[in-house]
Curated annotation (Swiss-Prot):
Organism for this UniProt entry: Paramagnetospirillum magneticum (strain ATCC 700264 / AMB-1)
Knockout consequences: Magnetite crystals are elongated and their surface structure is altered. Another deletion missing both mamD and a 25 kb region of the magnetsome island locus (called SID25) gives dumbbell-shaped magnetite crystals. Deletion of the probable mamGFDC operon leads to a slight reduction in magnetic response and slightly narrower magnetite crystals.
Domain notes: The isolated charged lumenal magnetite-interacting component (MIC, residues 298-314) binds Fe(2+) and Ni(2+); Ni(2+)-binding may not be physiological. Although it binds iron the protein fragment has no effect on magnetite crystal formation in an iron co-precipitation experiment, however mutating some of its residues decreases crystal size.
Protein name per UniProt: Magnetosome protein MamD
Domain of life: Bacteria
Signal peptide interval: none
Residue span of region GL repeat: 261-270
Post-translational modification: Seen in gels as a band of about 7 kDa, suggesting it may undergo cleavage. Upon overexpression a larger (full-length) protein is seen in the cell inner membrane.
């Protein structure tokens, strides 16, 4: 993101005069440290220079660095909570001018409350967020918090700002990039600056954000749902998994198996499943399984007496 310069000026009239050039280029022709006056001259012929009075010495120094350079004039930031009058200038060179004009949009500015919030503002600069609906319980009023939902996924960020409860409702659902906070009369910026993100970019990234929030929930934790991880569904759908056989109806029972049960299970041609099935089904179940196993291998059925005799010999 190009270096966006926000300057606080003396009056609303000065801010509106500069804002009338929004989307156009201009040159910072003069900045006086003695009077705090700055002269901005439109690039287009026939337009008169605009003189504004800067609010702080720090901003005088910042604009002095732009003297003789071309800037893209932005719309006057929508300052929430009566935090003064501002102008927005973005340095541009050659081909960057067209890109800056295309992405021009009205900035939104609000003052944060509390030192902790101000200290954390630099970490948000350059990142994209969607303004979220305040999580307010029924019958209560929203606190002075602005909720930022990171584009691409992440924890919801709550920032205490002035007049949030009454003047930020129109921002909900919109996506912005956080711009660097201007510093006035101190060492830390106290202003949250939101730059509109293009609709196409916001939708493209936002679609991925939904997946990022829900996918981790399916693979975290130690509960039963988490135990069914990736691959479990395919293992349940392997060939033959849905076939109903007498083994399925063997029931549940003890897993403690004797040597006799092991021998009978293997003798029935059930392989390693024999001990578990016999332990669950008991002697009567073994007889039924014996009949099923003989039919499976094409062996003629035995009489009831022969069947009981075979089971008794084990």
């Amino acid at each position: 993101m190009q270096d966006l310069l926000l300057a606080k000026v003396e009056s609303a009239m000065q801010a509106s005069q500069v804002s009338a050039l929004a989307g156009q280029t201009a040159t910072v022709t003069k900045v006086s440290a003695a009077t705090n006056l700055a002269t901005i001259t439109p690039t287009a012929a026939g337009q008169a220079p605009i003189i504004v009075k800067l609010d702080a010495t720090r901003q005088v120094v910042e604009l002095q660095a732009l003297v003789g350079k071309t800037v893209m004039v932005g719309k006057t930031p929508a300052a929430i909570g009566g935090i003064g009058n501002w102008i927005a200038l973005t340095p541009v060179t050659g081909a960057k001018a067209a890109a800056a004009a295309t992405g021009a949009g009205q900035l939104v500015m609000m003052k944060v409350e509390g030192t902790a919030a101000a200290v954390n503002l630099p970490a948000l600069a350059g990142k994209s967020f969607t303004i979220a609906q305040p999580p307010v319980a029924a019958g209560t009023k929203a606190a002075g918090m602005l909720y930022l939902n990171p584009v691409g996924g992440g924890d919801l960020i709550a920032i205490n700002v002035q007049n949030a409860a009454t003047q930020t409702g129109g921002l909900v659902g919109k996506t912005f990039v956080v711009a660097p906070s201007p510093v006035i009369g101190g060492t830390t910026g106290k202003f949250l600056v939101l730059k509109p993100l293009t609709a196409g970019a916001g939708k493209a990234v936002g679609g991925g954000a939904i997946a990022a929030k829900f996918i981790p929930a399916a693979v975290t934790g130690t509960g039963g749902a988490a135990a069914v991880g990736a691959g479990s569904a395919s293992s349940l759908l392997t060939a033959g998994a849905g076939t109903v056989t007498p083994i399925t109806a063997a029931g549940t029972g003890s897993a403690m198996l004797s040597a006799k049960g092991l021998g009978l299970g293997l003798g029935l041609g059930l392989g390693a499943w024999g001990p578990f099935l016999l332990g669950a089904a008991g002697l009567a179940g073994a007889a039924a399984l014996y009949v099923w196993a003989r039919r499976r291998h094409g062996t003629p059925d035995l009489s009831d007496d022969a069947l009981l005799a075979a089971a008794g010999e084990e």
